[in-house]
């Protein structure tokens, strides 16, 4: 490097001297000439590169800002997956990504709400009194706050279908056999209960300690039900059947409070109107009616599943009631 600097300086000095000899009027100022060294050239190159990089970053950031609304499109197009453009029957845009129009339905409100399975065997009685024992602390904690009560109920009611569907799914894989449609039926139940929760979240805004209670209850109930289903599926399904009977009772009390004016009959959330295909002017009472009907259908499905096991058969031997609403 030192040789390069000296050689460059020597060339500059020789060039200036020759120009002075050819044209004497050109002043000889070799003593004031500063020769650019290699280090200076490097610094200049680095500054140029950084300036170019900064310019490119500004351009790219501007492009990102301009494409803020196209971020999702860029992501999905990168993977080759394009979102479907879905519209309602009237041509308006479908705004829900958590469910699609073909997953919506009109609930059957004519279902018998008073059906009850009388416990006769020891597992049935154990399941029945387990559910009854859980009702007492719930009544004590929520009392007549039925919106929050419904929210807590749905966080628990959405667990059995997922656990049962998961275990039946694993059994189907393990034994290389079909499930008779029960995987889908149980997962449908779990998804339906979750939609109940999403609906009541719009009605009852839970505070911090209710959210903490949900975390604790869900953690305990999930593991307890998982073990219970592994030990005795007929007991697990029977318990859910009784749990749904309690849910019917709870929503019936909810309706009484609405009819008596103790709870304001507010307009139905938009998500409920689209999910259950309710009228545009539907109210909270209409929502509670369809949710109660859903719980009655879940009651029937789980008591039916328990009866299959009581008869010494497996779920795959009886076609699952898929789409039973």
From Swiss-Prot:
**Which reaction is recorded as catalysed by this protein?**
2 a ubiquinol + O2 = 2 a ubiquinone + 2 H2O
The cofactor named in the record is: Fe cation
Q: Where are the transmembrane segments?
A: 150-170, 212-232
Q: Name one GO molecular function term.
A: ubiquinol:oxygen oxidoreductase activity
Recite the UniProt cofactor note for this protein.
Binds 2 iron ions per subunit.
| Tissue expression summary | Expressed in flowers. Detected only in stamen.
Listed name of the protein: Ubiquinol oxidase 1b, mitochondrial
Record's GO cellular component terms: chloroplast; mitochondrial inner membrane; mitochondrion
Q: What is its EC number?
A: 1.10.3.11
The alphabetical list of record keywords is: Disulfide bond, Electron transport, Iron, Membrane, Metal-binding, Mitochondrion, Mitochondrion inner membrane, Oxidoreductase, Respiratory chain, Transit peptide, Transmembrane, Transmembrane helix, Transport
Please name one Pfam family that this protein belongs to.
AOX
In this chain, Fe cation 2 is annotated as bound at: 193, 244, 295, 298
The superkingdom of the source organism is Eukaryota
Q: Transit peptide located at which residues?
A: 1-44
Assembly and partners are described as:
Homodimer; disulfide-linked.
How does the UniProt record describe the way this protein sits in the membrane? Multi-pass membrane protein
Q: What induces it?
A: No effect of antimycin A, ethylene or cold treatments.
Q: What is the lineage of its organism?
A: Eukaryota, Viridiplantae, Streptophyta, Embryophyta, Tracheophyta
Which class of enzymes does this protein belong to?
A: oxidoreductase
Q: For binding Fe cation 1, which residues are annotated in this chain's numbering? A: 154, 193, 196, 295
Record localization: Mitochondrion inner membrane
What does the similarity note say? Belongs to the alternative oxidase family.
